[in-house]
Amino acid sequence: MDDFRKYATKHLGMNGMVLDDVIKSQAGYLNPYILEERQLNVTQLDVFSRLMMDRIIFLGTQVDDYTANTLQAQLLYLDSVDPGKDISIYINSPGGSVYAGLGIYDTMQFISSDVATICTGMAASMAAVLLVAGAEGKRSALPHSRVMIHQPMGGAQGQASDIEITAREIQKLKKELYTIIADHSHTDFDKVWADSDRDYWMTAQEAKEYGMIDEVLIKK
């Protein structure tokens, strides 16, 4: 830690007192924080917030209402501060709520900035829909990533009429999701329907051939 302090103060010109306070507060922990000294002050950010300053967003959890609200807010904010400049979403997610995911999808289509999507591990279910929904020519995956599409799942209980209502809604969602995948991947709707009847797994290369992505990233 002494070597780090010497390097930071002598070679980077960072303020020693401020640096000591930060080191003391982080003692015993290894948190993903970035420490930057600017002309007037020192700013500490978690690594994800720092990356967002470079217009990089992460979807690394299950898609739920909280995740969707956060991603939509990030997309809207970045589009407002620099309209039309690309935004990148790195995806490693098993999917989740269809309704929450469709909120993210609609926001991606609504903003003026192109949204590049990159699969870094797995894009399954609703996450696969978001992957393919990126700007055409700007969708990619790392070599050992996996992409999976399937039909939406749901359950119902209660009176028969309530079960029928839920079943009709699931069928509507099914058609919506398959239409989104077919339109963005330029794959025949009937093929998407048939393939999604059960879990349909694809390697990165297979996802490219299917039209889910445009490129398999080998090296930056």
Swiss-Prot record:
Pfam families: CLP_protease
Top-rank lineage group of the source organism: Bacteria
Keyword Protease recorded: yes
Gene Ontology terms, MF aspect: ATP-dependent peptidase activity; ATPase binding; serine-type endopeptidase activity
One Gene Ontology term, aspect cellular component: endopeptidase Clp complex
The EC number(s) this enzyme carries: 3.4.21.92
GO biological process: protein quality control for misfolded or incompletely synthesized proteins
InterPro entries the UniProt entry points to: ClpP, ClpP/crotonase-like_dom_sf, ClpP/TepA, ClpP_His_AS
Keyword match Membrane: no
Main location: cytoplasm
Subcellular location: Cytoplasm
Alphabetical UniProt keywords: Cytoplasm, Hydrolase, Protease, Serine protease
Family: Belongs to the peptidase S14 family.
Quaternary data: Fourteen ClpP subunits assemble into 2 heptameric rings which stack back to back to give a disk-like structure with a central cavity, resembling the structure of eukaryotic proteasomes.
Name of the protein described by the UniProt record: ATP-dependent Clp protease proteolytic subunit
The species this protein was found in: Bacteroides thetaiotaomicron (strain ATCC 29148 / DSM 2079 / JCM 5827 / CCUG 10774 / NCTC 10582 / VPI-5482 / E50)
